[in-house]
A protein has these predicted regions:
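Noncatalytic alpha-helical scaffold of FAD-dependent oxidoreductases
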Residues: 1-233
Length: 233
């Protein structure tokens, strides 16, 4: 199932509903008595909920039905907040509790810059025409790594001020440049150190890799666009 998880690209694409068992709609399982059956939330729900983490002790999962979503036309409206010390970070975390239960908010994340500064990302999934303040657009021939954009364009060089407090980024670009897609993993791999040190390598890979080649699952957008959903097995 590891190959299927990676192939569908649903293992970690959402901070909210990222794991395969949170994404799956049905399992086709061969039980220990060699009987093949389909498990869903509505049918055999007790066994369905036991499958994740059972390590094949219940049965062998041979197929999974998942929900996929077309990302065209979806954007992430991102608000940035900067905390310069631990006290400010704790105050920011406390203030973010008011966002709990807000269906508009897809995720809240904290990234650290140079081990000291903390940038909070409050991401809201939207379905709109291309905003005028978009950072990434598909007609641009060069795209930054997201964290490069964050550390150089969003936060000032001295790390003490936000240069951009709010922006919109095309969802497939946000997921592809920031989330655990191939681009992010390759760049963070110590064995691929040359990607960090040579600008022409970032240029080369940034030009060659396109977000349209990577299908991503995002439950937050599925709440607003039912017509774009389908199931794949």
């Amino acid at each position: 199932m590891g190959g299927a998880i990676q192939g569908f690209g649903v293992e970690s694409t959402s901070m909210e509903h990222g794991f395969l068992h949170s994404t799956a709609r049905a399992y086709r399982v061969v039980l220990l008595n060699e009987e093949a059956t389909v498990l869903t939330v509505d049918r055999e729900h007790e066994i369905f909920n036991v499958i994740p983490g059972s390590f094949n002790t219940v049965g062998l999962v041979v197929a999974v039905q998942v929900e996929l979503l077309l990302l065209d036309g979806h954007w992430m409206d991102i608000e940035y907040r900067l905390a310069l010390d631990r006290a400010a970070m704790l105050r920011t975390v406390h203030s973010l509790h008011s966002l709990r239960g807000d269906d508009r908010v897809d995720s809240v994340e904290c990234l650290r810059i140079d081990g000291a500064d903390n940038v909070f990302l409050i991401a809201i999934g939207t379905v709109v025409a291309a905003p005028s303040a978009a950072v990434f657009s598909m007609d641009r021939w060069w795209h930054h790594f997201y964290h490069f954009h964050l550390f150089h364009d969003v936060v000032g060089g001295d790390g003490t001020a936000l240069l951009i407090e709010r922006e919109s980024i095309e969802l497939k670009q946000f997921l592809f440049r920031h989330d655990r897609g191939a681009f992010w993993v390759i760049h963070d791999d110590p064995a691929m150190w040359f990607l960090r040190h040579f600008g022409f390598m970032r240029f080369l890979f940034g030009h060659m890799l396109a977000a349209e080649d990577l299908y991503r699952f995002r439950r937050g957008c599925a709440r607003s666009v039912d017509a774009s959903r389908w199931s794949a097995q």
